[in-house]
Curated annotation (Swiss-Prot):
<comment type="function">
    <text>S-adenosyl-L-methionine-dependent methyltransferase that acts as a component of the wyosine derivatives biosynthesis pathway.</text>
</comment>
<keyword id="KW-0489">Methyltransferase</keyword>
<dbReference type="GO" id="GO:0008175">
    <property type="term" value="F:tRNA methyltransferase activity"/>
</dbReference>
<protein>
    <recommendedName>
        <fullName>tRNA(Phe) 7-((3-amino-3-carboxypropyl)-4-demethylwyosine(37)-N(4))-methyltransferase 2</fullName>
        <ecNumber>2.1.1.282</ecNumber>
    </recommendedName>
</protein>
<keyword id="KW-0819">tRNA processing</keyword>
<dbReference type="GO" id="GO:0031591">
    <property type="term" value="P:wybutosine biosynthetic process"/>
</dbReference>
<dbReference type="GO" id="GO:0030488">
    <property type="term" value="P:tRNA methylation"/>
</dbReference>
<keyword id="KW-0949">S-adenosyl-L-methionine</keyword>
<dbReference type="InterPro" id="IPR003827">
    <property type="entry name" value="tRNA_yW-synthesising"/>
</dbReference>
<comment type="similarity">
    <text>Belongs to the TYW3 family.</text>
</comment>
<dbReference type="InterPro" id="IPR022908">
    <property type="entry name" value="Taw3"/>
</dbReference>
<keyword id="KW-0808">Transferase</keyword>
<dbReference type="InterPro" id="IPR036602">
    <property type="entry name" value="tRNA_yW-synthesising-like_sf"/>
</dbReference>
<dbReference type="Pfam" id="PF02676">
    <property type="entry name" value="TYW3"/>
</dbReference>
């Protein structure tokens, strides 16, 4: 219960500070309201341009622009002017949710929820006597654009990959309503967590 309490307080604070992706706030609140379940880091899907010192050097990477809605060509062009050192990629990534459960039974149910909602990369594993379910889609796109501040692709090609990336982003997001429906069904089955009810009333005035 202590871990969920801390997770809820962190989520509520992030919501108040507008640090949670707007289109998944209600879904996150729904998931966290379920008994024996809470979320950690989650994202509604994003697209952007990232600069990496070398392949796989994620800790040192730098987003030149990152948005959770379709990106505009003009935004991408402007962001590319700030490239300095390293490999430049356009990346589009689907929604991802990290859901912790207190039982294997709940983990299996949420695993099935993810898969049946179209998130085909959904998996789960054991961490510190709890179960972590990663609800993840397949709509990943990574396109190299240049290196060390130089862009090697034409505007026409950049427009093309942005269009594809935006389509993939929205395809991933289109599965969110189905995911919400499934979690609503789970809540009806499992019940609402009194801790969520108490804390949300105090912190969010829901």
């Amino acid at each position: 219960m202590k871990a969920k309490r801390e997770a809820l307080l962190s989520l509520f604070q992030a919501i108040k500070e507008n640090k949670v992706d707007e289109d998944i706030v209600e879904l996150l609140l729904l998931i966290n309201s379920i008994k024996g379940v809470y979320t950690t880091s989650s994202c509604s899907g994003r697209i952007g341009i990232i600069e990496e010192p070398s392949l796989g050097a994620k800790p040192l990477s730098r987003w030149l622009i990152k948005v959770h809605r379709p990106i505009k060509f003009e935004e991408a062009k402007k962001a590319l002017k700030n490239a300095q050192k390293g490999l430049i990629f356009l990346k589009s990534q689907p929604p991802i949710f990290h859901v912790v459960t207190e039982s294997l039974e709940l983990a299996r149910k949420i695993h099935e929820i993810g898969l049946s909602s179209g998130f085909k990369y959904t998996t789960y594993k054991v961490i510190s006597r709890r179960y972590l379910v990663e609800i993840n889609g397949t709509e990943y796109l990574t396109v190299p654009l240049g290196k060390d501040g130089k862009v090697f692709v034409t505007d026409e090609y950049l427009e093309f990959v942005i269009e594809i990336g935006n389509q993939m982003l929205m395809r991933g997001k289109s599965r969110l309503p189905r995911l919400r429906e499934k979690f609503e069904e789970l809540k009806e089955e499992v019940g609402e967590d009194p801790l969520f009810t108490t804390l949300s009333t105090e912190k969010l005035s829901l």
